[in-house]
């Protein structure tokens, strides 16, 4: 078994990275930040290499906070709007990325397995909860869909837990 890691600027395409015909291509916490076009091209390169594929922690749109608050849905909606902005790879797929990845691999004859891998947060994850809350507030503010006072109010809420949904995807060439 030989494992290699390569640091590359993927915004220029992944074809050259896969010229060595790897057996497995992996990524983590990435595909919700890239465009549907990038995903289509990426999958095409993996298929051309006849490699297996595994990605973990692709955000799938589930964002639940505890205790719940009436402002949650407004902040989450603004967060999802922000998710769709360009992060350097075109308009991001955001929560649609897991389905788009699976569809593209299936279209290309791959066998796809998906599984949910949510972050189930509780009071022992206080720092992570605070960081996620701050990220949601910053993203919501950036969209200008939420006024600053509302975002500040939501950000100051005491949260003791929540669920942040992710999907893991594994794909192998069929037949």
Please report, for each region that a protein language model flagged, where it lies by residue.
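A short, conserved alpha-helix within the catalytic core of class I
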Residues: 13-15, 31-51, 55-58
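A conserved beta-strand element that flanks and buttresses the S-adenosyl-L-methionine
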Residues: 26
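C-terminal helical/coil "lid" or tail adjacent to the Rossmann-like core of SAM-dependent
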Residues: 113-158
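Conserved acidic residues
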Residues: 23
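Core SAM-dependent methyltransferase catalytic element
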Residues: 164-175
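Conserved catalytic/acceptor-binding region of the Class I
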Residues: 51-116
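Active-site charged/polar residues at nucleotide-handling catalytic sites that mediate phosphoryl
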Residues: 20
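S-adenosyl-L-methionine
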Residues: 1-17
């Amino acid at each position: 078994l030989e494992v290699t890691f390569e640091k590359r600027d993927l915004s220029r395409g992944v074809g050259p990275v896969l010229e060595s015909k790897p057996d497995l291509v992996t990524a983590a916490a990435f595909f919700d930040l890239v465009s549907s076009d990038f995903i289509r091209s990426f999958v095409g390169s993996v298929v051309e290499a006849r490699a297996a594929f595994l990605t973990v922690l692709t955000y799938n749109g589930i964002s639940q906070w505890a205790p719940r608050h009436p402002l949650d849905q407004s902040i989450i909606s603004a967060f999802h709007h922000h998710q769709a902005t360009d992060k350097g790879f075109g308009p991001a797929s955001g929560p649609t990325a897991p389905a788009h990845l699976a569809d593209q691999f299936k279209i290309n004859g791959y066998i796809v397995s998906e599984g949910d891998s949510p972050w189930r947060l509780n009071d022992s994850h206080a720092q992570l909860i605070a960081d996620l809350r701050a990220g949601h507030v910053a993203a919501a503010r950036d969209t200008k869909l939420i006024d600053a006072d509302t975002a500040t109010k939501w950000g100051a809420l005491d949260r003791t837990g929540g669920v942040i949904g992710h999907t893991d995807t594994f794909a192998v060439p069929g037949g």
